[in-house]
Regions:
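Non-catalytic alpha-helical scaffold/packing segments enriched in small hydrophobic residues
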Residues: 66-69, 80, 93, 97-100
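Metallocofactor- and cofactor-centric catalytic cores in central/energy metabolism, strongly enriched
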Residues: 52, 86, 90-95, 99-103, ...
Length: 174
């Protein structure tokens, strides 16, 4: 089968040609921007909570900030999510669980580290048992604070959405 689409020649079996055609369409700017818009406004996080930042995130979900209006819908099962929120200190034992949860998430997937403990270990920074998320996962956004204010969390969500829409997010491998 031979077909020409503005310089793209598809030769071979139907499956291979279809895969190339889909990749060509996805790489076109209008379709990519629609796809990135859809991903940006359907961030469904799985919370990996090991410290107090998880309680502070509840304030972000409350009516005053209402992150659900930004398409931020929490889910329980990692196979239904595309954003991992690490909230708290990661020990070596929990790091294995974090990687296991991350590997279950479908593509494209993103990671945010929330709080001083998640960023660099917090008060446990020099412990032998602490693992920084950036050493085991591709962290997209860091939210500083102990715990971070709800405004900072909402701002981080907006920053991630902007990076996705611009195609600059680490998790966009497609």
């Amino acid at each position: 089968m031979v077909c020409g689409m503005s310089g793209l020649t598809l030769v071979g079996n139907l499956e291979e040609s279809a895969r190339k055609a889909v990749q060509w369409l996805v790489n076109k700017t209008p379709i990519r921007s629609i796809r990135d818009w859809g991903i940006a406004f359907s961030l469904w996080p799985v919370h990996f909570t090991t410290a107090c930042c998880g309680a502070e995130f509840a304030a972000t979900s409350a009516p005053r900030f209402d992150v659900e209006r930004m398409g931020f819908l929490p889910f329980v099962a990692p196979r239904q999510t595309n954003l991992m929120l690490i909230e708290g200190t990661l020990t070596r034992k929990m790091a294995k669980a974090a990687v296991w949860v991350y590997e279950q998430m479908p593509e494209p997937k993103f990671v945010m580290a929330m709080g001083a403990c998640a960023i660099d270990g917090g008060i446990f920074w020099n412990s032998y048992n602490i693992v920084r998320p950036k050493d085991i996962l591709p962290v997209e956004i860091y939210i500083p604070g102990c715990p971070p204010r709800p405004e900072a969390v909402a701002r981080a969500i907006l920053m991630l959405q902007k990076r996705i829409r611009e195609g600059k997010a680490i998790g966009l491998k497609i």
